[in-house]
Amino acid sequence: MQNNSFLARLVRGNLVLQILAGILLGAAMATFSPEYAQKVGLIGNLFVGALKAVAPVLVFILVASSIANQKKNQHTYMRPIVVLYLFGTFSAALTAVILSFLFPTTLVLATGAEGATPPQGIAEVLNTLLFKLVDNPVSALMNANYIGILAWGVGLGLALHHSSSTTKAVFEDLSHGISQIVRFIIRLAPFGIFGLVASTFATTGFDALAGYAQLLAVLLGAMAFIALVVNPMIVYYKIRRNPFPLVLQCLRESGVTAFFTRSSAANIPVNMALCEKLKLDEDTYSVSIPLGATINMAGAAITITVLTLAAVHTMGIEVDLMTALLLSVVAAVSACGASGVAGGSLLLIPLACGLFGISNDIAMQVVAVGFIIGVIQDSAETALNSSTDVLFTAAVCQAEHEKRA
């Protein structure tokens, strides 16, 4: 009976407070028992693995089900959401350029990224994304290719739109069943994050980051400015009321989990659950959230821009205003393709460095610096990217709902 009441309290408890407790316990274990802390990292890896496993199936079934069951004259709000995604990513790149000029950073270049192969140009990044669109559906599900999964989900949904009500009901029941599995996995977040924090702190520590304090300050400062100043301004423009309750809820309930899982794909189920909690339009968020995990990359745009300009300052290259603006555009477009590159935003740095004639050898040393600070940079980048997916979806859904009310 006591066990049942403990489990009931666990299920009914405040998830954010439970996650906070997991963070504190993980940090304490890493401090006092690093050896044991590395072992409990298994719990964290299992949690991330479970989220990554369920996410592709969730997206495919949810998209197919919502489109197949869509009523006539029912509106989805994808166009304004995509516009916000692209505008937000460009704003992030521009903010990073301004901060990099205000606080120029030079790097002690590192080695250690020799095994990585960056794309040869922006055409290659866009080409990769285009071919992901026509991937085999089984391959797309196995490799968590969300562009391909979305394409097949939308295609199947449209094909089943005129099918019998029984077929549609099967897909709807499947989507509810998978959503239940997702809710169960999300309730395990405190344990997963406890394991992730404990193993990360025990393995990495923060001594390695001390030498890159200014670079991290510029990176994190730009991300914080986007999260707490630019995004609220964009949301206010859409909903015309105080944006901070929504902004802070998205950061708290999506950003915190994304920070520790360091995976936009793993955070898709968390974002879907938050959209459901906010009572947003399911036909819209079932498409906009996985699409956002692929193209809404404000954090990646900041990483590419800041590290590229740090390389520029290190090499003593003069940069004029037009080149800086061009870098913002290249960083924003490259960031939208970051999901199509193994290694993500860091391996798009050589592409941006090419604008300034920086050799590939130097650019790959900058990438190596990115790997050193990755424990913080990648976490903060994912938190910003993923929480913004929900934020912009919620802002558009709420604004459109009030317009039609």
UniProtKB/Swiss-Prot annotation:
Pfam families attached here? Answer: SDF
Its Gene Ontology cellular component terms are:
plasma membrane
InterPro entries xref list: Na-dicarboxylate_symporter, Na:dicarbo_symporter_sf, Ser_Thr_transp_SstT
Q: Which gene encodes it?
A: sstT
Protein name per Swiss-Prot or TrEMBL:
Serine/threonine transporter SstT
Kindly indicate whether the keyword DNA-binding belongs to this entry: no
Record field: transmembrane: 13-33, 43-63, 81-101, 140-160, 191-211, 215-235, 297-317, 338-358, 362-382
| SUPFAM superfamilies to which the protein is assigned, alphabetical | Proton glutamate symport protein
Q: Which UniProt keyword terms apply here?
A: Amino-acid transport, Cell inner membrane, Cell membrane, Membrane, Symport, Transmembrane, Transmembrane helix, Transport
Where is it localised?
Cell inner membrane
